[in-house]
Amino acid sequence: MGGFTSIWHWVIVLLVIVLLFGAKKIPELAKGLGSGIKNFKKAVKDDEEEAKNEPKTLDAQVTQAKVHESSEIKNKQEG
């Protein structure tokens, strides 16, 4: 009644998993799952780092565009 709190629930779940996949496949499945989780965490970390670096790039582009625009205005005023 309290969910999967009893040890017998876990024993039955483990037994069903062994029956479905076989004892030899379980380590391969666990390895694949672990590898997938590792790759997912790496991708999330890479995206966070990219997001941190992105505003700096945009700020530099905006500043460069403003400098270019102001130099064009000066050239028009002088010419």
Swiss-Prot record:
Keywords: Cell inner membrane, Cell membrane, Membrane, Protein transport, Translocation, Transmembrane, Transmembrane helix, Transport. GO terms for molecular function: protein transmembrane transporter activity. GO terms for cellular component: TAT protein transport complex. It comes from the Bacteria. Residues 48-79 are annotated as: Disordered. It is found in: Cell inner membrane. GO terms for biological process: protein transport by the Tat complex. Residues 66-79 have a biased composition (Basic and acidic residues). The keyword Transmembrane helix applies. Signal peptide: none annotated. The chain crosses the membrane at residues 1-21. InterPro entries: TatA/B/E, TatA/E. Its main location: membrane. It holds the Pfam family TatA_B_E. It is a single-pass membrane protein. Part of the twin-arginine translocation (Tat) system that transports large folded proteins containing a characteristic twin-arginine motif in their signal peptide across membranes. TatA could form the protein-conducting channel of the Tat system. The Tat system comprises two distinct complexes: a TatABC complex, containing multiple copies of TatA, TatB and TatC subunits, and a separate TatA complex, containing only TatA subunits. Substrates initially bind to the TatABC complex, which probably triggers association of the separate TatA complex to form the active translocon. Belongs to the TatA/E family. This is Sec-independent protein translocase protein TatA.
